[in-house]
A protein has these predicted regions:
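Pyridoxal 5′-phosphate
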Residues: 1-171
């Protein structure tokens, strides 16, 4: 995660190598640009495989998770739109929703009670929502939300789901 201190030495080496040997992916036919483009595509392919995305071309890299969440939220939620969230959301979710003037419905439940949280989402999700935005794992508590079940509720009501997987990607 971006907030972790002391990245593994392999990360430092990979970044140094990239800065020495790569440049401008997709922007030229010279060796450094081709190397960067091939590396980016390999990364997209691995990410697509990890997350079950049908095609590497559907994988987008952003500066960080906050940027990605802003893109997703601002793409699906209009100004004044209706959204359901859990009570575990990070500021990267709540701030853009408030900036949009979204009408936010919190699926409130006692802390760490997955069954109660799922019931709260059952009562909160309806077709008039523009989206449900939900973390998978709380960055504060480490609580794992029942994301598969929440996703099923969203599918049943045909409501888009934005998942903040910052703390759980790959597990």
């Amino acid at each position: 995660a971006a907030t972790t201190f002391q990245k593994p030495l392999s990360v430092s080496y990979a970044m140094q190598r990239a800065m020495r040997t790569m440049s401008s992916p997709g922007r030229g036919g010279y060796a450094a640009a081709r190397a960067a483009e091939e590396t980016a595509f390999r990364c997209r392919s691995l990410a697509a495989e990890l997350f079950g995305v049908p095609s590497p071309e559907q994988v987008v890299f952003t500066s960080n998770a906050t940027h990605a969440l802003n893109i997703a939220i601002r793409s699906l939620v209009p100004e004044g739109g209706r959204v359901a969230v859990s009570g575990y959301e990070h500021n990267a979710v709540t701030r853009p929703l408030h900036a949009l003037g979204a009408r936010i419905k919190v699926a409130a439940s006692p802390l760490f009670d997955r069954a109660a949280l799922l019931r709260a989402f059952e009562n909160s999700i309806s077709p008039e929502l523009d989206a449900v935005v939900c973390t998978h794992v709380s960055n504060v508590f480490g609580f794992v939300l029942p994301i598969e079940e929440i996703a099923a509720l969203c599918r049943a009501e045909r409501v888009p789901l934005i998942v903040d997987a910052s703390q759980s990607a790959g597990i």
